[in-house]
Amino acid sequence: MSGTTQLRPTYHGYVRDTTDALIIFEACLAGQLLHVPRRPHDRERQNVIKSGSIFVYEEHASGIKRWTDSITWSPSRIMGNYLVYRQLEKPFAPGEKKRAKGKGGKSTTQSGGISKPRQRNALPFQQGLEQGNEYPSVPSDEDRQLVGSLVDSYDFKEQGLVKKTISITYNGVPHHLISYYTVEDVKAGLLTSPADDQGLRGVVPRAELTNGQNFRAPIEESIGGAYMPGMRHSAGFPHPSAYPTLLHQPQMHQPQVHQPLAHQPQVHQPLAHQPQVHQPLAHQPQVHQQYVHQPQAHQPYMHQPQVHLNGYQPSYGDGQWWKYLGGT
């Protein structure tokens, strides 16, 4: 029977962002990691409900409608695509509303490792640990990445647990992930995220997990502005993630992508050749006027007969030639 089988967490580590959860969901669907078949029994909770334990269950097969762990939690807060809870020092009194404290409540330096925002020139929390401070100053944005808005609103348990939950639907079946961790363990780099786990390096979430969900926030969106997706924290300092997919590209620096101006080739429209229409010159035939011969009127030559003497033409040596014409 499943009730007699020792319950083991699906994974040990810390889910930093949505992609970490999707890697675990994918590994479960592929059989590399195992869904849990049931909720932990009372006698098991002390051993399995602890920092680093991550449980994934499939709602239909397990029959789990509501996950229980017998820990007193604060009201939930939305943090990206997760719901986050923090362990309380004590349960609310019967009939007491779960109302957040006012500004005059417990100091945040006594609230589960979360401290007031440090100044910009203050030492990082690692140096505070080296100096022996139990709860050194840390940037408030790092706190919010770990606990959301649950910083100083309730009486949180010292070094208490934080619970993060996220759900997906695959082929119409709901799958749920429950993650436990302490702020101190995450800051100390004691918990590995799935994206940094060499054993899960080749796990790439299928498209139905990344595109087919009703997530409130984009998968790569940073939560609170401190722990950016694609960054892991070893001893509290961020380092580039080794995960090879695009889901964990660092978001710290967004280089401006200069889109080259699309070259618009000039389309040279060929000049439409307008052929010149040569109108043939209309041949005007030359009208040859028929030459009308105008006969020249020739005056008849009046022949003056010469008088020959003895058959010879007389000479005019005497200069009186007219005498020979009959003149006087």
From Swiss-Prot:
It comes from the Eukaryota. InterPro entries: Gti1/Pac2 (IPR018608). GO terms for cellular component: nucleus. Residues 106-116, 251-261, 282-293 have a biased composition (Low complexity). The keyword Signal does not apply. It is found in: Nucleus. GO terms for molecular function: DNA binding. Pfam families: Gti1_Pac2. Residues 94-120, 251-293 are annotated as: Disordered. Keywords: Nucleus, Transcription, Transcription regulation, Virulence. Belongs to the MIT1/WOR1 family. Global transcriptional regulator of transcription that impacts, but is not absolutely required for secondary metabolism and pathogenicity on maize. Regulates synthesis of multiple secondary metabolites, including fumonisins and fusarins. This is Global transcription regulator sge1. The lineage of its organism: Eukaryota, Fungi, Dikarya, Ascomycota, Pezizomycotina.
